[in-house]
């Protein structure tokens, strides 16, 4: 048997903060979000950033876009290491053009060695020393984004989570799921409802963000168990 074969979970240690942080290597989240009012120093555009204290990072995430909502959803489940790539809002002359531009910015590209959008997750290990293994783009994961997530998940040996975009029933969600054949992608449906303290009202909450947090929680505690049947904290079903 090779001497370098590893049995069990791998643990990584981050020593860049005031105290070392140890975590299961497979429990690291990689996420792409928008947030036009986020702190640009804490969340630069199209650059992977490692969050070792998600609760503190929420204070720099602003209130617009998907960033703050996604971080809050994750921290409701646990407080894992999260690699975040913030992308700019979509632009265009009409709603369809804006949506298309947003999709392009989320999927990203590699030009002259510069990684943007989801592609920036591929550079996380070289830049940050960690490899995200739980991937998602809460609130922005249409079919094109979900499709583009698959090869990234395969390269990172990760699991991607995406919403059943546009589906209004369980039967539609099942048909949507069947359009993807990759084992690295899990389709989530429906979204939840959660209280927004900024608006003092209930609103739809990203199920994918909660799935990311729950998966990290499970991998840090009982990694061989499935996610199904576990409660999502901080939200309720519609």
Predicted feature residues:
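A glycine- and small-residue-enriched flexible loop/hinge signal that marks low-structured segments
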Residues: 2-24, 28-56, 72-79, 87, ...
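Membrane helical hairpin/interfacial module
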Residues: 64-68, 80-84
